[in-house]
């Protein structure tokens, strides 16, 4: 073989191709790894999250490629839902979106999805006012601030570090900003009450006949 390479000066990769072509069919077939096919025997959940995984070639091929495990957070719930009053750097949320979430939870599917997720706040709107409730366990009224600025309702709360806690432990913090239309709500008449770790905020609404952005049209 060495004499052939020396005499004909065949490149190494050409020689490898010739050797592979001359191998028995059964030997070539044995060198091929079987491909696992995800057939109909695997039951898929339509509500499960489908994620693509890149694995090393040394991994087992069985069930390779996709992970159908259900994510820890229910897929029907928005990511910001449980943290709307927890993330100090969260972007302002529109009132319409918050109320839409409450409507979704009122449906059977929404109640089922919220069963595994503790809701720490509630929002509802009546003809007279907007009512908000925020759970802030461990906090008193001296730890909470509520104010209105730039057409937004801002709620912030920060607890105190208790004696005996780890130095790296941070006190409980709550923060939220909700955009409100000034022509609909009386931003200068907001009322807030903190009692037993629960903050209740009431934002009065402008009466229909007093709204400047509503114009009645006569029907002829």
Curated annotation (Swiss-Prot):
Residues 112-220 form the sHSP domain. GO terms for cellular component: mitochondrion. Residues 46-73 are annotated as: Disordered. Residues 51-73 have a biased composition (Basic and acidic residues). InterPro entries: A-crystallin/Hsp20_dom (IPR002068), HSP14.7/HSP23.5/HSP23.6-like (IPR044656), HSP20-like_chaperone (IPR008978). Induction: By heat and osmotic shock. It is found in: Mitochondrion. Pfam families: HSP20 (PF00011). Expressed in roots, stems, leaves, spikelets and embryos. Gene3D superfamilies: 2.60.40.790. Residues 1-21 form a transit peptide. GO terms for biological process: response to heat; response to osmotic stress. Keywords: Mitochondrion, Stress response, Transit peptide. Signal peptide: none annotated. Belongs to the small heat shock protein (HSP20) family. May form oligomeric structures. This is 24.1 kDa heat shock protein, mitochondrial. It comes from Oryza sativa subsp. japonica.
């Amino acid at each position: 073989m060495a004499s052939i390479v020396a005499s004909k000066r065949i490149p190494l990769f050409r020689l490898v191709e010739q050797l592979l072509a001359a191998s028995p069919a059964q030997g070539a077939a044995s060198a091929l790894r079987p491909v696992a096919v995800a057939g109909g025997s695997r039951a898929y959940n339509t509500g499960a999250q489908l994620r693509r995984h890149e694995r090393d070639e040394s991994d087992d091929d069985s069930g390779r490629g996709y992970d159908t495990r259900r994510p820890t957070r229910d897929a029907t719930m928005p990511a910001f839902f449980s943290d709307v009053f927890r993330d100090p750097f969260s972007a302002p949320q529109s009132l319409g979106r918050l109320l839409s979430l409450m409507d979704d939870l009122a449906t059977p599917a929404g109640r089922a999805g919220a069963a595994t997720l503790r809701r720490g706040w509630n929002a509802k709107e009546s003809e007279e006012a907007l009512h908000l409730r925020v759970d802030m366990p461990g906090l008193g009224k001296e730890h909470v601030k509520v104010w209105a600025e730039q057409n937004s309702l801002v709620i912030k709360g920060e607890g105190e570090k208790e004696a005996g806690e780890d130095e790296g432990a941070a006190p409980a913090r709550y923060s939220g900003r909700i955009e409100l239309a000034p022509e609909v709500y009386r931003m200068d008449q907001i009322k807030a009450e903190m009692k037993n770790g629960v903050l209740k905020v009431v934002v009065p609404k402008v009466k229909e006949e007093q709204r400047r952005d509503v114009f009645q049209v006569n029907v002829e």
